[in-house]
């Protein structure tokens, strides 16, 4: 659609700048399993692996279980729980949030907000609010492209500051019925509240099964 072209060009320029100026490049891969339960409830299990240092060394692996409930058509609430293993530590993360998706075929618009708490041994818990907006464009029955932006806010009694933002673009490919491949690129800047920020390229792939 013609009115999306300037937006895609802007995102492309930002991502191109990110690729050239990033401090590191990571790879993210995952496999997911999703099923629908009675009463409009969805259950999802994801297993992920992430590499850092120009995709040459282990960063983390994680297992995540998520349950979601569709309140009305397009509106959901969800609670994901994640257990992540790093080289020298483990982290547990629990989130709660909601999303709303509006279809305007062949486009769809989605807004998601969630509150996230991360626990780590001998460290104070880390609380964040994450807000994400995405636009999907259905090219044909099997192919869908998307762009998205996400901001992270530190959340405590004393401050509510931006700590990270991400810009992503990618493709969702329907391989077979109820099987989907996702290929994406993300540019993120983290530690915005610190004196030195990190700019990171992320190249990712995910495979999802629905039952």
Q: What would you call each of these model-derived segments?
A:
Residues 1-23, 210-211:
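Cleavable N-terminal export/targeting peptides
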Residues 21-78:
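Start-of-domain marker
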Residues 39-45, 73-79, 105-109, 141-145, ...:
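Repeated loop/turn-to-beta-strand initiation elements of outer-membrane beta-barrel proteins
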Residues 99-102, 106-153:
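Detector for outer-membrane/organellar transmembrane beta-barrel domains
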């Amino acid at each position: 659609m013609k009115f999306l072209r300037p937006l895609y060009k802007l995102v492309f320029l930002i991502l191109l700048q990110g690729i050239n100026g990033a401090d590191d490049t990571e790879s993210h891969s995952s496999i997911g399993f999703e099923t629908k339960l009675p009463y409009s409830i969805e259950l999802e299990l994801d297993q992920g692996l992430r590499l850092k240092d120009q995709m040459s060394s282990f960063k983390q692996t994680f297992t995540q279980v998520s349950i979601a409930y569709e309140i009305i058509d397009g509106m959901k609430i969800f609670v994901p729980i994640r257990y992540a293993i790093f080289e020298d530590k483990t982290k547990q993360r629990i989130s709660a949030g909601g999303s709303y998706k509006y279809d305007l075929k062949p486009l769809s618009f989605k807004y998601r907000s969630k509150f996230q708490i991360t626990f780590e041994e001998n460290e104070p818990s880390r609380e964040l609010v994450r807000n994400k907006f995405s636009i999907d464009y259905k090219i044909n029955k099997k192919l869908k492209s998307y762009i998205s932006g996400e901001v992270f806010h530190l959340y405590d009694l004393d401050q509510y500051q931006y700590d990270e933002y991400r810009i992503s673009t990618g493709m969702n490919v329907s391989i077979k019925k109820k099987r989907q491949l996702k290929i994406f690129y993300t540019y993120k800047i983290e530690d915005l509240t610190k004196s030195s920020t990190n700019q990171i390229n992320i190249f990712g792939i995910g495979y999802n099964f629905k039952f």
